[in-house]
Amino acid sequence: ITKNYFNAVSNQFLPMHSAACEPIDNILSNSTGPVNALVAFVPGSEKDLIGMVTADWGNGMDINEVSESLQFGSRHTDEGPLCIHGVGLNNFLLVATRNKYPWFIATKKPEEDSYHLVDGPFDTKMKIVEQQDIPLADIVMRDAYKPLGAPSTIIYVEMDKSTASTMLTQNGSCAPSKVSSLNVLRRSIAEHFGVKYRNYLKPDDSGAAPARILIPDYQMANGKTCDVFVKPIFQRYKAVTGTQHLSVNYNGHDIPVSVEVGLLNAAATQTRAVTGGYALKHYYQGNMSTQGVDIQLGDRVIATAQLDTIWDRARHPSFNLFTGTIAIDISDLPRGFLNTLANKSNIDLSDEGWRAIFDAVKDAVPVVEDKTCPLEEYAKQFAERIMNNTGNKVKLQFPVYANRTRIDVLEYIDENHCNIYDFMSTAANMKSVAELRTHWDGMVSQGCQPVSATMFTTSRGPMLSHTCEELNSLIQSMPDDKMKAALKVAKGDVAKLPHYNLEIVVDKNLPR
């Protein structure tokens, strides 16, 4: 292994909200009894760098174990289904820091007096030093955990805003300008962890949960700042089928699978669901991108919004409220029997075991469709009014970018110009503006110039109008050849080039 290898691994596609699960998975697997974890975001050592701290009060590692855990040629341990201290840990360290920013691991067994500390970046040879003082004591020694004494393991990484911003989306797209404060990251990671670790964070009948994840200095929705424990997030239903129990035989093993599906109660699920009283941003939005079921491996949610990977159905607005959980009991399965992608960021569809499970689910459990589909009907009536008032040709659910997204209502003004209309039954946010722009760019690429793009919604934030104004001051995206032709027509006057014309409109008549 050379230094070039470390750089290559650091550039893999792994959003930070998935990479950051690795320390938590390690903590869950390397603890005896109740799990106590901490995740903090602090200013980095330089401007525009952000520090992320994880700590736990579990079993820790001795000097041999920490040395082994950082060896790229070594495999993870077999302790538990989440495994510990393997390639995933190194993935996290490299992806977070891009192998150019500081990191360290300090760990010890509970009975040891000093920490075994390793500083990054990675090199072919690295030193382990001993340290008796608790690293970052002012951050990790919070009042809630002081009775537990010193942490067993502390991991610190620094990242730039581009990397940090991949926590703020589901697909890992990069938008460093969105990292406006550390609390944006705290709120986002609370949502991701609240979904992925909900079964660990859910209190039992006595009020105690198997695991706690503390986030220090968290700004609540009411403006108060305090240390808080991550809240588990479960979808809530307005209609649900009974749980079906399947036994899937594959490769000599009977795999117990439980399936629950139904229709999402979007308003009840989203309202104050995230730690601190915030609404959901990434999950259970009641739209096409979040429709589908969660995949649960043991107690860990490893994938959400699964639809066409299981059923032979394309995403469609009538499935916007379709949700549920496929839970796989892995207690009697060998370690690694069902493969996942790096850091359990998703299912590995090349593993035939998953195909066997999904085929069994598809045969036994139908997709639940919202037959009323009130928003789609509302859009249909809107389209009819356009045709009656203007005589223009209108298309519903128009596919853009080879069916990767759809426009609710597309009005053809003539052969070369159109108006775009989209509808949503929940509050509009920055994603709504991004969706409008995606639809605009898609029509441009398909040879039809939009004149306007409007999103009708039940409510919107105060800054969305300003965001639209900023975008509307920009020249639209287009290929170089089209830009060259447009400049020629405009005789070099950029003011005459096609600009965006996006608008978010509140329509109180929209069905909710």
Question: Where do the model's predicted regions map?
Answer:
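Active-site metal-binding core of divalent-cation-utilizing nuclease and nuclease-like domains
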Residues: D308, M387-E415, A427-M430
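Glycine-rich G1-box
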Residues: N59-G60
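Acidic ATP/Mg2+-coordinating residue in the GHKL
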Residues: D56
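Nucleic-acid nuclease catalytic cores
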Residues: N99-S114, M424-S425, D441-K488
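Charged regulatory segments coupled to nucleotide-binding catalytic modules in large multidomain enzymes
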Residues: A239-Q381, R385, N389, N403
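GHKL-type ATPase core
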Residues: G80-Y218
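Bergerat-fold ATP-binding/catalytic subdomain of histidine kinases
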Residues: E68-P81
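Bergerat-fold GHKL ATPase/HATPase_c domain
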Residues: I1-P43, K47, N64-L70, L338, ...
